[in-house]
């Protein structure tokens, strides 16, 4: 039987989601737990596939993974979470077709990037973001180059301000490596007056204009959701979600205390503004 899981994680202490030999990753932790519980012996024979990889420090709320198992009764979020570290949580599961591929069958993916600070002209960012909508060659917004197809369809960009935080939501059919972080970097440059909309238009025409762009930091990025043409029959695990909320609250308390500690190390006026 093939099972899909929705996974959330705090990516700060992981070298990305995809398994690596010597570094801690989200998949590495999942593989260990699934094997320990007798749910999956080997990711290759179980045809383990994720909806996509996230880079070092990037977080997720709606990562989707799928695998074959002879023990679907054990492949439940609350069972899996009992062995996972306190920064990774399965929170929903679904029985899916044998050929279900979370990556290839995805209709779209949604990311959220969170910025801190009021130094941006939000009206400029909103105006510039409209240029990115639709089908474009995003070569200038990707770390990888070459013959790989680089045309993507951006379906939605929403920008909201809450206090000192700016949230940028981006939905596309799929994303190139570092594409979201480079889009955010470009919008930050326009919003701060370093660049203008004309430059952004040139960036969308890589055949005539090419420029390297440093991506925004990974710690502000969250994979929010993955959408499929035929909605999956997700079963949310209420107990797993409650326990995850408790752990998230613990992290919030720790980070809030740490923020105050940092504000007293070589304090400045800007330190007080961050709290």
UniProtKB/Swiss-Prot annotation:
Catalytic activity: uridine(38/39/40) in tRNA = pseudouridine(38/39/40) in tRNA
Gene3D superfamilies: Pseudouridine synthase I, catalytic domain, C-terminal subdomain, Pseudouridine synthase I, catalytic domain, N-terminal subdomain
Keywords of this entry: Isomerase, tRNA processing
Active site: 55
EC numbers for this chain: 5.4.99.12
Keyword Zinc: no
GO molecular function: RNA binding; tRNA pseudouridine(38-40) synthase activity
Assigned protein family: Belongs to the tRNA pseudouridine synthase TruA family.
Protein name, as recorded: tRNA pseudouridine synthase A
Name of the gene: truA
């Amino acid at each position: 039987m093939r099972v899909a899981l929705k996974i959330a994680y705090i990516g700060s202490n992981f070298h990305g989601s995809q398994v690596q030999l010597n570094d801690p990753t989200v998949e590495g932790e999942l593989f260990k737990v699934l094997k320990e519980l007798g749910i999956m012996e080997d990711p290759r024979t179980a045809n383990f596939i994720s909806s996509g990889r996230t880079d070092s420090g990037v977080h997720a709320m709606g990562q989707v993974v799928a695998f074959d198992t002879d023990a679907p009764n054990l492949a439940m979020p609350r069972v899996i979470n009992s062995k996972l570290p306190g920064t990774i949580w399965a929170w929903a599961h679904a029985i899916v077709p044998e050929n279900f591929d979370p990556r290839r069958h995805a209709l779209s993916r949604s990311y959220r990037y969170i910025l801190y600070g009021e130094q941006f002209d939000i009206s400029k960012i909103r105006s510039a973001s409209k240029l990115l909508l639709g089908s474009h060659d995003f070569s200038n917004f990707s770390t990888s180059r070459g013959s790989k197809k680089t045309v993507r369809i951006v379906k939605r960009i929403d920008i909201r301000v809450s206090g000192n935080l700016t949230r940028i939501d981006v939905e596309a059919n799929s994303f190139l490596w570092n594409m979201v972080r480079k889009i955010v970097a470009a919008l930050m440059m326009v919003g701060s007056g370093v660049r203008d909309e004309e430059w952004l238009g040139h960036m969308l025409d890589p055949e005539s204009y090419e420029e390297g762009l440093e991506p925004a930091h990974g710690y502000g990025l969250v994979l929010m959701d993955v959408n499929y043409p035929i909605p999956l029959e997700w079963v949310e695990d209420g107990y797993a979600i409650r326990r995850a909320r408790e752990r998230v609250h613990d992290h919030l308390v720790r980070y809030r205390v740490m923020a105050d500690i940092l504000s007293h190390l070589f304090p400045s006026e800007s330190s007080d503004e961050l709290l």
